[in-house]
């Protein structure tokens, strides 16, 4: 907490496991203020995870046999953590959704991660001698239909599933094509689902153009019926539609910010409507966008444009600080997923295509 310097939760704990004592450290990405809605981190300061880990590991090491870091940093940052804090024996990671079939070893530290969406159960067996980890066996157990149901979990799922099934299973329309919301795609390039969503945003609020962070699109929809549940899966966040007014130079800055990390996956990569732009990945970040066309005309730096976006981006989420100086014209309060559902109901059957709105010069 900025005001007191106190942590908002437990940073570490010591837990007896059989005849061993295990220390567990919790670490999250310092990018949190950029990848969540700014209102969620008001009054908080994110400390450097490596420096925090060094302090906690030094404190725990004399008390425990094993130190486990439970992290949400991503595989690359986990490697850096392992190299910087060798006192950590095991890193159980997340954030990058990396599926590690066996542990990655950095020095004497073992890094494991199961992928995403509960597709795998991680199994880890440690062998200790004289208080030191001397061997680790790690593997992934795929969670398939062959895995026996857990009675207590089944009871909970059945209870809530019955209440939700009727609503989420309601068909609102259909698509004749795959709606591409794959993580690797919406974070690096234009997709037909990104086009569809931003078209709906632009039409709903009546803006010149629309932008939506790719990281807010969480799944694809297969060709066939579209249900309310499908739309919730694609757009699980409670983002609402906002219409702002901003200068062309700020819009250009937003597009540069969108492609600054390309070809790396980036949750802030923008899906767009009402504009087309070309960028050159060989150029330095901040100077990659070469052409921008809005409504058939070249972008004018000093011209004012109306932009539809979501409240996360409008508040500066994903590092879009230029939106914080934009003039908010309308805060609709309408959920983005509700706008999408209404559109699909009205259209009945859809078949959006990629239109060449975003072009990378290769």
Annotate each PLM feature.
Residues 1-162, 186-200, 210, 260-263, ...:
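Acidic, metal/ion-coordinating pockets
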Residues 10-12, 133, 195-362:
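Feature captures C-terminal
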Residues 14-16, 125-127, 178, 245, ...:
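Generic structural detector for well-ordered beta-strands
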Residues 29-30, 165-176, 227-229, 308-315:
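Short, compositionally biased low-complexity segments
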Residues 137-140, 171-178, 243-245:
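Short amphipathic
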Residues 170-192:
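Glycine-rich phosphate/diphosphate-binding loops and the adjacent beta-loop-alpha structural elements
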